[in-house]
């Protein structure tokens, strides 16, 4: 199970991947200074740190509200979601296109073609993913963080 939760008072997003805890921090918070700390409260761009190297960012996850796009940038790869007005969100990973079908209840399913590869639930500043294939765990952990950043952004905008 993957669980991403925003810790607002700490200004971080914790991502639990099995027993490990990954940490997402706003990029502005890393630069110091009061102005940057204030800007970090409204950030839509986060660095993700894994327990193996807690001081070196593993990836950058950002959200663009204007086009409803979650962007994931690792050292090797880059992925971004594509949204449509009435259709599902899509994302390409490993040469495969996945579709994300969301419900108004916060539940969603990630499909490869017509086969479900993961199911999720959005909560208040949180995202939980279950029933996924092990080889997708790292990718889905990044996506879970992106969903929490998306939720936080819409809280600020809406």
Predicted feature residues:
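Intrinsically disordered, low-complexity proline/glycine-rich segments
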Residues: 1-158
